[in-house]
């Protein structure tokens, strides 16, 4: 489901539901997920590309019964990870912008395991590339990323950034329970 109208039909209270009303209060915002990778990779022109993709998409929230109840994410086990390869993990600016957007916009943010340590994976190579084990936790693991002191400098910066942002969000009711105001 890669357009908001198709997704909205599945949310409880949707005026677009075909037969009867679905009882799902929360649905996954796959259209937003598909835009996130592009939005933070492209230059934003005047009314096109880049972050305008997000602006334009959010302006269409009226199709949802409750946009605040959408599950929003940059990646999951059925998609390529936000970082599809090792080279992309070097761009922490892209990571910080995307994570900040996810944790401050409307909806219920979901972070896929490994995002905090910049795990990467390309779905086109197979499910195993996006569902790799988190490093650590087993005696045979050569690296234990459950302990922040075992992270490399880039992973540590990403980890501490997301931890700080999540702690800030936790203590900020307007971010977690407020509403989104869309301005032109």
Which residues does each PLM region occupy?
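Surface beta-strand/loop "capping" patches
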Residues: 175-184
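Loop/turn elements at helix/coil->beta-strand transitions in domains of secreted/extracellular proteins
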Residues: 66-70, 106-110
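Active-site-proximal helices and loops of the catalytic beta/alpha 8
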Residues: 1-64, 91-92, 101, 118-168, ...
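Active-site clefts of carbohydrate-active enzymes
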Residues: 67-90
């Amino acid at each position: 489901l890669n357009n908001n109208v198709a997704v909205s039909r599945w949310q409880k209270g949707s005026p677009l539901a075909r037969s009867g009303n679905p009882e799902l209060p929360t649905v996954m915002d796959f259209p937003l997920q598909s835009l996130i990778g592009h939005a933070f990779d492209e230059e934003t022109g005047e009314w096109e590309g880049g972050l305008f993709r997000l602006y334009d998409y959010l302006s269409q929230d009226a199709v949802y019964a409750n946009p605040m109840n959408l599950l929003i994410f940059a990646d999951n086990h059925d998609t390529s990870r936000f970082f599809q390869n090792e080279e992309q993990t070097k761009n922490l600016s892209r990571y910080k912008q995307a994570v900040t957007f996810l944790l401050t916009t409307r909806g219920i943010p979901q972070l896929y395991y490994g995002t905090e340590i910049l795990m990467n994976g390309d779905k086109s190579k197979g499910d195993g590339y996006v569902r790799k084990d988190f490093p650590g936790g087993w005696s045979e693991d050569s690296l234990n990323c459950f302990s922040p002191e075992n992270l490399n400098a880039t992973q540590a910066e990403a980890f501490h950034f997301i931890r700080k942002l999540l702690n800030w969000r936790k203590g900020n009711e307007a971010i977690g329970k407020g509403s989104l105001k869309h301005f032109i």
